[in-house]
């Protein structure tokens, strides 16, 4: 478990204190995939560097597995960092070394295994990330996705308990991003690793995370289970991320609906309710006609969800609203 207890970070620049992270409390459970999302300067990279103690907090405590890592001396920090793997945005591979040697590097530096043990470990890791046939290649011979897989294998080399991902997919195309996220999900599931990833893309959070914290100006402005935050955003920053993911401009959409008659509502379905024939049932029971103005069906990690924007006309409108709520469907009245 990772706990931030009133942690804050301030930098001294030209004689002035510049806050990078305001007092923050946060808990990340063991085995969780936890996402930190925010635009540049939000403070998410600072939080990542605080977790692995590349940065020391200006105040507060960081507790990992019951130990206060803010109080560690140099030797304790060295041992602790061996339990924390790191995946970088731009891969950070050594161009002069082969794939196998890049993966082996943390083990060589640790100096605790024989060459034979290191070679065996590297072979296992390359097989795990699907690069068993690329061991003798150099980074320049690999695609972006393959380079990131090397980075993942290297991060796993010391058998870490925690894996930190710093914008790990932002330099990749959408198809490669999906395959890397699938690999991270498999690693989380099979190795029971705690994964903390930072991103500015809600789609990354939606695909792989269990919980998310939304950051803005050095503060966590909203946090919770991904489905709850994604489907029912409250803070303006969260709403903007959701709209960017859905590629929807709410202002333009409302203008498009300005001349549509009737009441306009947005329904959000989760789980089995996503596929239930609710609209037809409500229309028959209440006499309310509907037209579908916009909609989508997708998944948040393994949970299906659907969103429909409807125009409702005639019949018993209040009964229809009550029926939607009784079916455990979230309803937002837009007009």
From Swiss-Prot:
This is Methionine import ATP-binding protein MetN 2. The complex is composed of two ATP-binding proteins (MetN), two transmembrane proteins (MetI) and a solute-binding protein (MetQ). ATP binds at residues 38-45. Pfam families: ABC_tran (PF00005), NIL (PF09383). It catalyses: L-methionine(out) + ATP + H2O = L-methionine(in) + ADP + phosphate + H(+); D-methionine(out) + ATP + H2O = D-methionine(in) + ADP + phosphate + H(+). GO terms for molecular function: ABC-type D-methionine transporter activity; ATP binding; ATP hydrolysis activity. Disulfide bonds: none annotated. GO terms for cellular component: plasma membrane. Gene3D superfamilies: 3.30.70.260, P-loop containing nucleotide triphosphate hydrolases. The keyword Cell membrane applies. It comes from the Bacteria. It is a peripheral membrane protein. It comes from Pseudomonas entomophila (strain L48). Belongs to the ABC transporter superfamily. Methionine importer (TC 3.A.1.24) family. It is found in: Cell inner membrane. Part of the ABC transporter complex MetNIQ involved in methionine import. Responsible for energy coupling to the transport system. Keywords: Amino-acid transport, ATP-binding, Cell inner membrane, Cell membrane, Membrane, Nucleotide-binding, Translocase, Transport. Residues 2-242 form the ABC transporter domain. The gene is metN2. Its main location: membrane. Its EC number is 7.4.2.11. SMART domains: AAA, NIL. The keyword Transmembrane helix does not apply.
């Amino acid at each position: 478990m990772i706990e931030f207890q009133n942690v804050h970070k301030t930098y001294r620049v030209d004689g002035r204190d510049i806050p990078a992270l305001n007092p923050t409390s946060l808990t990340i459970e063991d085995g969780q995939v936890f996402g930190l999302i925010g635009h540049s300067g939000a403070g998410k990279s600072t939080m990542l560097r605080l977790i692995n103690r590349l940065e020391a907090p200006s105040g507060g405590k960081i507790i990992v597995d019951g130990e206060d890592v803010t109080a560690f001396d140099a030797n304790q920090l060295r041992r602790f960092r061996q339990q924390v793997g790191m995946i970088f945005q731009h891969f950070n591979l050594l161009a002069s070394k082969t794939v196998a040697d890049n993966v082996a590097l943390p083990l060589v530096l640790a100096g605790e295994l024989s060459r034979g043990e290191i070679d065996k470990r590297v072979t296992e890791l390359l097989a795990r990330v699907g690069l068993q046939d690329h061991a003798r290649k150099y980074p320049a011979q690999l695609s972006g996705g393959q380079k990131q897989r090397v980075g993942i294998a290297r991060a796993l080399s010391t058998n870490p308990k925690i894996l930190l991902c710093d914008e790990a997919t932002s330099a990749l195309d959408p198809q490669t991003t999906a395959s890397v996220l699938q690999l991270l999900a498999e690693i989380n599931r099979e190795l029971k690793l705690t994964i903390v990833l930072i991103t500015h893309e809600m789609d990354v959070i939606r695909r792989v995370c269990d919980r998310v914290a939304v950051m803005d100006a050095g503060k966590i402005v909203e946090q919770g289970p991904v489905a709850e935050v994604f489907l029912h955003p409250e803070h303006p920053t969260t709403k903007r991320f959701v709209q960017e993911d859905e590629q929807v401009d709410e202002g333009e959409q409302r203008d498009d609906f300005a001349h549509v008659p009737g009441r306009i509502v947005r329904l959000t379905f989760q789980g089995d309710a996503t596929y239930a024939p609710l609209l037809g049932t409500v229309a028959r029971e209440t006499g309310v006609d509907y037209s579908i103005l916009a909609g989508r069906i997708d998944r948040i990690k393994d949970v299906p969800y659907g969103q429909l924007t409807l125009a409702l006309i005639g019949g018993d409108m209040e009964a229809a609203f009550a029926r939607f709520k009784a079916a455990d469907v979230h309803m937002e009245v837009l007009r």
